[in-house]
Amino acid sequence: MSQMTPREIVSELDKFIVGQQAAKKAVAIALRNRWRRMQVDKSLRNEITPKNILMIGPTGVGKTEIARRLAKLANAPFIKVEATKFTEVGYVGRDVESIVRDLVDGSIKLFREQEMAKCRYRAMEAAEERILDALLPPARSSGEEQHESSTRQIFRKKLREGDLDDKEIEIEMAATPVGVEIMAPPGMEDMTSQLQNMFSSMSSGKTRKAKLTVKKAFKKLTDEEAAKLINEEELKAQAIEAAEQNGIVFIDEIDKVTKRDNASGADVSREGVQRDLLPLIEGCTVSTKHGMIKTDHILFIASGAFHLSKPSDLIPELQGRLPIRVELEALSPEDFERILTEPDASLTEQHQALLATEGVSLAFSKDGIRRIAETAFDVNERTENIGARRLHTVLEKLLEEASFNTDGESVEIVVDAAFVDKQLGELATNEDLSRYIL
């Protein structure tokens, strides 16, 4: 679990997301409170429940990006889901309890990766011995044993230096579990995975011989040896505990399940989904293939654009379970400028790196960046406002000719205001063209 302070979390998010300080502060405090809760006395710890967050803001301003970056920072079980994928219990589709099942599966995967990383060195040593056994015939006498020992050291040195990577050897390794594809109706994924696990366990313990290059064999044997060193029962217990105590669920597009006054037809995936989410967010026990999971201390962060609805259109009970409200601001031309240059691996850096592979040197001048930002902002204002995502469209159209005409020769392209006007002038000013092309 992350031990970063709120200030450090915001500083890390600043590297990738421009502005939106209120939202960053809210998620940073919520993440830090997870750590703070684990430090208090156990009797009080169970009484401290997470304060769930509702992020409100137009599309393309950074709501989903905050979730993506938070997942990497949290170092805790984390899952991001779309509210629109769920239907209420009794209808075809996924029920909301599958969120918790996926969270637990993700937690087990996270802990398995951490454990495998810890015992990686021991696993590599064991894999090395198995490859040397395959490369060298067994000794038949004590004299041969001594000779084999020195030969083994020579081969070990060659193996570590990569001289034997392309040599093909025959090794005995664990048999691949039987692959059984089961087509099940939506909403029955849990039963499907249990059936697949049952068929997989039927082939466990069996081995097979395979011919592989030393490089591929070393990787497969390292993974196999690492898996042997892991205590699966202990790992599952720790992963379930982490999911219950430190798990974070990010529910995107929550506004799409609000009831609309002018909507006709059954609200299968709307109010019903909200009512199903209530016990999950309030705290209940969910049955999974790994056992019963309590959701009392899982942190829920919901987000939505609320273009066609308002947060007050959510059912009152759900509003009460999302006590912290954060409003994200619409992006200005200045924000677009910063998005193009400031974040790590910014859009301009990505395009420069891609074209550099073919000898094209791409340079962006300050007035060029400004003009790109203004163009994206103007198109957003005149057509649909899709926020920072508009920059992807504008940049792709701007550099289309440069990307198409590369032929391996060294070329220098300077993207200034004149270049932008030449490539995008007509598209940006003609509303019909910008609506369908940009």
UniProtKB/Swiss-Prot annotation:
Positions of ATP binding: 18, 60-65, 252, 317, 389
CDD domains tied to this protein: RecA-like_HslU
Signal sequence coordinates: none
Gene Ontology cellular component terms for the protein in this record: HslUV protease complex
GO biological process: protein unfolding; proteolysis involved in protein catabolic process
Membership in a protein family: Belongs to the ClpX chaperone family. HslU subfamily.
Quaternary structure (record): A double ring-shaped homohexamer of HslV is capped on each side by a ring-shaped HslU homohexamer. The assembly of the HslU/HslV complex is dependent on binding of ATP.
Described function: ATPase subunit of a proteasome-like degradation complex; this subunit has chaperone activity. The binding of ATP and its subsequent hydrolysis by HslU are essential for unfolding of protein substrates subsequently hydrolyzed by HslV. HslU recognizes the N-terminal part of its protein substrates and unfolds these before they are guided to HslV for hydrolysis.
NCBIfam families reported in the protein's UniProt record: hslU (TIGR00390), PRK05201.1 (NF003544)
Protein name (database record): ATP-dependent protease ATPase subunit HslU
Gene name per UniProt: hslU
